[in-house]
């Protein structure tokens, strides 16, 4: 591999002696914080700017950017950032190399050569670029409709992710290709369906007693609590369980390693569920009161239901076999779900009598369509303030100064009903027919029994005794006095990359719930809630006063016919179907694309996606770099790096941190901030962003000021409920949205406070909401709108009803999914979590003869974030080539040695990667690296064809609900790359001239990528 020759110290030394200070750009925007500070310093004095790192797209690590004379010279960890503990990983430190890279895009460009060839980029002005975009979009829209223009976005740098989303409204298109479809999206999709949006996020930062790390290596990179935090959490846990097909870095330290076959996560989750149920390790009160486990299933009647709200606010019809009052009584409510009360006779003797004898009901009429008792049980007594009674949480290993949070005591039923979880009961329907009904729990119990440890062992390859031991360790409370479980499950990206993505995530959500780990300390809590909601800042996510497309536009979304639940979800179109539509024109032509940080290599078969990109009439790409994808663009626009921009920021997950990404230095030359570009497009298209006369297209200063105005010392509006004998009353409290006094009048004031205070704890900012656990009990789970939790300052929108429960059709965590049942009536097996074998896996007897090895992929690499950083010299020097991990015994069978280039092949494509012999993968499994390309290759596409793993996948192997690509657990064959079987007689990939890629750490081309400080004016 050669010797490492370029150290971080070498670069810092170079940075100190090279070039002049970067010049200012864009007088209309906030100046870089460091520049303002320089008025009082001189010479070699430096400023440390607190900010939020975006070296990867996941973790909100607090860092300091060290700026000297207008130039950023290094990034270091912020020890005061409680969520990241001063962590500063290799990607973060290398951000300086990205910001000052000689290959950064500085100016708008247009292509001059045909697509599929080297683009022949020509510099143009911003005015020419933007006018060309408007003209082409309007022409295509006039010919084919807004749906002929698609939007694409990558992962969560929020300023591009949500700027792109508003473009859907602007262009009136339902079609957006999202990395979200294969990255966190299936988790968010599934949890929205069965509990609450993004309840997959786990509060690892409060250090659970049992830490379950499922399908990821967050000790290396990514996810809300990663790197140093993950190591600390795992080290302090009483029990650490790692579930992974390969031995991850922290896996070797785990108490239990569940070494499963790739793609069998769902079977293992159901096996754990079986153990939990059979050993009665579940939280009985939670299961009975806050899930639909006691609701009764009637399989001898036609499903019926009621209209309820989609994620976008439109309506759809629930059709369910769950027994309702309307099924047993003419004129009865379809919202009242019946349960059998084991205590009915005792209560009757005490003078509490149910309307239907042994059966009582829960009313899920959350919008008060029929009566006011929605959200409550028959005859219930409930008081919001009593629901909050409890104590401060008592997690053992919090960092000094970290807020514990308020833990309400579990609230028993009042009156003391006892909903049955088991049994079979007779009831007479309104047509006079007597039927037998069973609780959902009976069906769930039977489903889990299909995957008891002995069965799951055959599927997963893990011994049954080890499955039972790990599940028991997770479910058995180490300290029962806490009143909650040992912790949630940090299930990560791997579980989403199969045709069972949604079912996998539903299985985890239910498992967390029944063990008493939903919204509890160290449990799964969902996205952090704070008033600024940095993940959804106003200027990049929504446009107050702007118009939204009519509902019929959303009904045109590509892929909705193949995946009906996309019509319920509505946050992405199916990427596979979109690329097909570009090529075939079916179901209608898609002729243009707007892309902000999206990457065609992340999902679908890459070869098919490339064909589609080359077929577009017009394509605009916003980026920092020349990339494989934008080699097919017609116009590319240069954008700012994270150290060159301002953005509010809160933890996307459960870490509970609030801060900011702060502009440290000016962007180079003519690079602009994504929201400014989108706003300019809106102005040129006469699409009004606000309804404020004279400020229809506000500048970035106004938008930033607007983004923090709900941060206040006032208590925001909330509602308390008092229910007596089933009769509810409510009272509003706090200050209405439009009347709050902002704590900081301007963005600059907020940033100044952030520099002085550091990261705030959301538990302190919103004590009734994020600062309180068991929000399903207090009503705070429904305090904000049903998906994003967005607050609309001007209209007071986004405020929920504060009723206890969840935002599901039944207002319960749904073990039996009414959403799935309603959209897939012909698949009764999908109503409960289930397991499906991966297509093209080892159970495919015909294929395994030719393709004997199971491929997995997607692991975290310390120096890269998916496709990013391949041109950063520190990173590429440390990890110059893609590696395929092969068990040494397997490698010996194929005559492969450490460092050999290896061909990996399926019937859909073949690639080359370098052998890395590792006993941490099983003998019949190989582990491939993903999204590789070679910036040094100047041919169109920058050599993505050489090693990009998704060339190997079946384009049409998808999850039947979300459309997610089956990216892992498929069969491949391997053989050593030799001069005889390689182009140019070279096992190392070469460009069209025969020049090899950079494949050693001492390649002199790496030095050509060292930072430059010239040409930024």
Curated annotation (Swiss-Prot):
| Domain of life assignment | Bacteria
Which residues of the sequence carry a binding annotation for [4Fe-4S] cluster?
53, 56, 61, 89
Q: What class of enzyme is it?
A: oxidoreductase
Q: How is it modified after translation?
A: Predicted to be exported by the Tat system. The position of the signal peptide cleavage has not been experimentally proven.
Induction statement: Up-regulated in response to dopamine.
Matching entries from Pfam families are given as: Molybdop_Fe4S4, Molybdopterin, Molydop_binding
What cofactors are annotated for this protein?
[4Fe-4S] cluster; Mo-bis(molybdopterin guanine dinucleotide)
User: Per its record, what are the GO molecular function terms?
Assistant: 4 iron, 4 sulfur cluster binding; acetylene hydratase activity; metal ion binding; molybdopterin cofactor binding; oxidoreductase activity
Q: Can you tell me which residues the record assigns to a coiled coil?
A: none
* Enzyme Commission number(s): 1.-.-.-
Please tell me what else the database record remarks about this protein: E.lenta strain ATCC 25559 / DSM 2243 is not able to dehydroxylate dopamine, likely due to the presence of a serine residue in position 506 in this protein, instead of an arginine residue in dopamine metabolizing strains.
Q: Where is the active site?
A: 91 (electron donor/acceptor)
Which family is it part of? Answer: Belongs to the prokaryotic molybdopterin-containing oxidoreductase family.
Q: Which InterPro entries match?
A: Asp_de-COase-like_dom_sf, MopB_CT_Acetylene-hydratase, MoPterin_dinucl-bd_dom, Mopterin_OxRdtase, Mopterin_OxRdtase_4Fe-4S_dom, Prok_Mopterin_Oxidored, TAT_signal
Query: Do you know which Gene3D superfamilies this protein is assigned to?
Result: 2.40.40.20, 3.40.50.740, ADC-like domains (2.20.25.90), Dimethylsulfoxide Reductase, domain 2 (3.40.228.10)
By what name is this protein known? Uncharacterized oxidoreductase Elen_0471
Note how many cofactor molecules are bound and how.
Binds 1 [4Fe-4S] cluster.
What are the boundaries of the signal sequence? Answer: 1-34
Record-annotated 4Fe-4S Mo/W bis-MGD-type domain positions: 45-103
Sorted alphabetically, the keyword list is: 4Fe-4S, Iron, Iron-sulfur, Metal-binding, Molybdenum, Oxidoreductase, Signal
